[in-house]
Amino acid sequence: MHVNPEEITALAHAEAVAPRYDIYVLIHKALRAYMVDTLLAVGQLDVDDEAALAQAAQRVTELLAFCRSHLMHENQFIHPAMERHAAGSSQAIAADHVDHERAIDALGAVV
């Protein structure tokens, strides 16, 4: 995740306006919960238990598929809508998504 100090400063000094619905907050909260739940399962894994190992590998594979689907959805629907509203507004996020896709591919290669 990249933090832009100028954006943080602008937010801190922004005038109060009517709150906007944040389309990102709930899905990303759910994604973090899914990732943490999967991490806990992997962390508690007995690697000598072949059935448990297979189940954990399946959980990780399903998580990676969900994350990839989420990225594709944002790239296909959310980013174009952002760009229609404000040109260039999705560029930083699109770059993050490239990094996320590489990480998903790398993790998927070892599961």
Model-inferred region functions:
Residues 1-111:
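Small-residue-biased structural context
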